[in-house]
Amino acid sequence: MPRSLKKGPFIDLHLLKKVEKAMEAGDKKPIKTWSRRSMIIPNMIGLTIAVHNGRQHVPVFVTDEMIGHKLGEFSPTRTYRGHAADKKAKKR
């Protein structure tokens, strides 16, 4: 169930401070964060945010279509390597 509109979007304060600091300085370096639960807000457009996926930080360039989504949606935590192949079928 989505978050109530009267509450507004959730964003961690430490991430919000980093975003505001980068916007006023015009800094284009990636902002490292572990906060996958934070929502993307219009202030983040044009920034690169490195979102942690459990092993490494995945760089995510924020565009206007991403507003309202969570940062964790753009940093997959699992790698899919495909199903096991049938060795008998390959020989034929």
Swiss-Prot record:
A Pfam short name: Ribosomal_S19
Xref: PROSITE patterns: RIBOSOMAL_S19
Coiled coil location: none
Signal peptide range: none
Gene Ontology biological process terms, A to Z: ribosomal small subunit assembly; translation
Keywords in alphabetical order: Ribonucleoprotein, Ribosomal protein, RNA-binding, rRNA-binding
Record's function text: Protein S19 forms a complex with S13 that binds strongly to the 16S ribosomal RNA.
Family: Belongs to the universal ribosomal protein uS19 family.
Cited PANTHER family: RIBOSOMAL PROTEIN S19P FAMILY MEMBER (PTHR11880), SMALL RIBOSOMAL SUBUNIT PROTEIN US19M (PTHR11880:SF8)
Protein name in UniProt: Small ribosomal subunit protein uS19
Native source organism of the sequence: Shewanella baltica (strain OS155 / ATCC BAA-1091)
Gene that produces this protein: rpsS
